[in-house]
Swiss-Prot record:
Pfam families cross-referenced by the UniProt entry: IF-2B
UniProt family annotation: Belongs to the eIF-2B alpha/beta/delta subunits family. MtnA subfamily.
Reaction catalyzed: 5-(methylsulfanyl)-alpha-D-ribose 1-phosphate = 5-(methylsulfanyl)-D-ribulose 1-phosphate
Coiled coil segments of this chain: none
Pathway: Amino-acid biosynthesis; L-methionine biosynthesis via salvage pathway; L-methionine from S-methyl-5-thio-alpha-D-ribose 1-phosphate: step 1/6
Localisation per UniProt entry: Cytoplasm; Nucleus
Organism the protein comes from: Aedes aegypti (Yellowfever mosquito)
Record-marked site positions (Transition state stabilizer): 166
Keyword Nucleus in record: yes
Function, as annotated: Catalyzes the interconversion of methylthioribose-1-phosphate (MTR-1-P) into methylthioribulose-1-phosphate (MTRu-1-P).
EC nos: 5.3.1.23
GO molecular function, one term: S-methyl-5-thioribose-1-phosphate isomerase activity
Lineage of source species: Eukaryota, Metazoa, Ecdysozoa, Arthropoda, Hexapoda
Name of the protein in its database record: Methylthioribose-1-phosphate isomerase
Length: 360
């Protein structure tokens, strides 16, 4: 059984504090929007899908026991709090899109004269709570689509070695995972020979979180340093790279954890297929290309210290972007729950899917 990083029931939310992993597994209460904002901003929860789910559930917790006099009051309160949650980590598009969807729902419910404010709140809460189940189902579809596309290039039923970066598993989603979901599916199919995960400096999500999940699930795995990827590709047969995404632009450029871009460059040189695994909601057609994606910069201390111990010379300047952009020309395919798309066809395919859904 994979890890459960988010626990929610009847207006009560607990999250696994990822800052304490792997030394300590501790769940913390999220009692409202302010707690949700802080947990996202401090990276007690991280991963674009999990950020959206925890952010929205923190709003559910806050309004669960609250009484509202009018539908307009309800709409104004949830809209303001959703916009505030988006500001916690703006690079991840999932929270922004979830906020937009919920604000649209609140507007529609407010205009429906046939329902009361209590019914409006009930339907709004159900929409948030349904996100948990939908995310897990979407992740399992991503896992299957990814495993199928990777194995389609492997003759005679052979097993594969996979490289992944950062953390994209149960700790980054409601469960199962995106890129790590692909790896889990390969393992379930008895087609995974080995997985390599990078340490993912400076926050070490690979060493602390992905390695933790891989050990927990008993997957055959090896941790490598970030600067060993080229040597790995040169010395061992790696079938594919599979990474996650915080935002995918309309042209296929992809923002993901810092270090992803250099893996893409090295994979291209060594002819290793490079896949991005992400929910459909991570694709942002409003962003034409990666150079328009706002990249969050993190505090110097994350580079200069490990825990309380300084490892860098005092006085040295630091540059600490949380993400980089892997250009579309380096990406073999973008794996979603709705299919696998080549970057060149992404915009057209996504528009077709959106248009079809709007007609249903």
């Amino acid at each position: 059984m994979s890890l459960k990083a988010i626990k929610y029931s009847n207006g009560k939310l607990e999250i696994l504090d990822q800052l304490l992993l792997p030394a300590q597994s501790k769940y913390i209460d999220v009692k409202g929007v302010e707690d949700g904002w802080k947990a996202i901003n401090k990276m007690q929860v991280r991963g674009a899908p999990a950020i959206a789910i925890v952010g929205c559930l923190s709003l559910a917790v806050e309004i669960f026991g609250e009484k509202f006099d009018t539908k307009q009051t309800f709409k104004q309160e949830v809209e303001g709090k959703l916009n505030y949650l988006v500001s916690a980590r703006p690079t991840a598009v999932n929270m922004k899109l979830a906020a937009e969807d919920l604000i649209s729902l609140a507007n529609a419910l407010a205009q429906d004269e046939s329902i009361s404010v209590d019914t409006m709140k009930e339907r709004f809460l159900k929409a948030i709570e349904d996100m948990l189940d939908k995310d897990i189902a979407d992740n399992m579809a991503i896992g299957k689509n990814g495993a199928d596309i990777i194995l389609s290039h492997i003759p005679n039923g052979g097993s594969v070695r996979i490289l992944t970066h950062c953390n994209t598993g149960s700790l980054a989603t409601a469960g199962y995972g995106t890129a790590l979901g692909v790896i889990r599916k390969l393992h379930e199919m008895n087609r995974l020979e080995h997985v390599y995960c990078t340490e993912t400096r400076p926050y070490n999500q690979g060493a602390r979180l992905t390695a933790y999940e891989l050990v927990h699930d008993k997957l055959p795995a090896t941790l490598i340093l970030d600067n060993m990827v080229a040597s790995l590709f040169k010395s061992r047969r790696v079938a594919a790279v599979v990474v996650g995404a915080d935002r995918v632009a309309a042209n296929g450029d992809t923002a993901n954890k810092i270090g992803t871009y250099q893996i893409g460059v090295v994979a291209k040189y060594h002819d290793v297929p490079f896949y991005v695994a992400a929910p459909f909601t991570s694709i942002d057609l409003k962003i034409p290309s990666g150079d328009r994606i706002v990249i969050e910069e993190r505090p110097d201390r994350e580079m200069t210290h490990v825990g309380e111990h300084r490892i860098a010379a005092p006085g040295i300047a630091c540059w600490n972007p949380a993400f980089d952009v892997t250009t579309a020309d380096l990406i073999t395919g973008i794996i979603t729950e709705k299919g696998v798309f080549k970057p060149a066809e992404l915009k057209e395919k996504v528009e077709q899917i959106i248009s079809t859904n709007q007609k249903l």
